[in-house]
Each structure stands twice: as structure tokens, then as C-alpha cells.
């Protein structure tokens, strides 16, 4: 199924000149999600399958995952060849603004409520780290 998802994304991207990474975002918030209960081995295999297919099509793959999925569902060693995008937001004004993720990350999403001139509403904000 992850390969089918990658093929779907590749088809959508055909008409665009993409120079940034293409992200795999596997989310599982609660037991109402179809993927709830997926083993770490299967979650990791799906992420890798998606990334391999995206790479075969000439794009740069990336894995987007929050704390639970990153620590409990993905084998970090197995997915380490791919770029990673990690969301972690400051929840109180007294918290320091830096990520607490133990593993290397390539992108850090530090906010979901930034204001950017020319864009209506709140948007996500990210920082890219250069390897």
C-alpha cells in the first residue's frame, strides 16, 4: 500500500518542477485510525517502501514523524538514510525553544501558528538543518 501511495504522489507531481523533498507522513493519533496497532516492523517497512519508490522516480524522499511514531514505530537506524522532518512545538511561554528529539533530524517544525506576510491565517514554520 505504501508503494501505491508513492505512485499516487508521483503522478500528482508530474506537472510540477519539484526541487524540495517529498515527505511520507504516517499518522496514528488514536484507535479510530485504520493503522492503529501496526507493528514497528511494518511501519518502518512502509516508510522505507514509500521512500524507495519516491527516490526511484527521481525525487528526494523524507519522513515526517512526531515523537510517538519516531520513537515507538520507526526503527531509526533503518530509516536513517532518508531525510527526517520532526514536529515539536513549544507549549508554554516559559519553555525553551529547541527540539528534544534524540536522533538527527533534517527539518524541525517548531510552530503551527506563525503569521507570514502574504499568507492568510496561521501556517507551520520549519527550520532546515544542513548535514
Regions found by a protein language model. Give the residues of each.
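Aromatic-lined carbohydrate-recognition surfaces of secreted/lumenal glycan-active proteins
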Residues: 54-72
Amino acid at each position: 500500500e505504501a508503494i501505491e501511495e508513492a505512485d499516487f504522489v508521483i503522478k500528482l507531481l508530474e506537472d510540477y518542477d519539484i526541487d524540495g523533498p517529498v515527505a511520507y507522513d504516517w499518522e496514528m493519533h488514536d484507535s479510530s485510525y485504520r493503522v492503529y496497532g501496526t507493528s514497528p516492523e511494518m511501519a518502518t517497512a512502509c516508510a522505507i517502501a514509500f521512500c524507495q519508490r519516491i527516490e526511484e522516480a527521481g525525487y528526494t524522499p523524507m519522513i515526517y514523524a512526531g515523537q510517538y511514531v519516531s520513537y515507538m514505530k520507526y526503527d531509526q537506524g533503518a530509516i536513517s538514510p532518508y531525510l527526517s522532518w520532526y514536529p515539536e512545538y513549544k507549549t508554554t511561554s516559559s519553555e525553551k525553544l529547541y527540539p528534544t528529539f534524540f536522533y538527527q533530524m533534517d527539518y524541525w517544525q517548531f510552530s503551527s501558528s506563525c503569521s507570514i506576510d502574504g499568507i492568510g491565517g496561521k501556517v507551520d514554520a520549519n527550520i532546515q538543518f544542513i548535514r
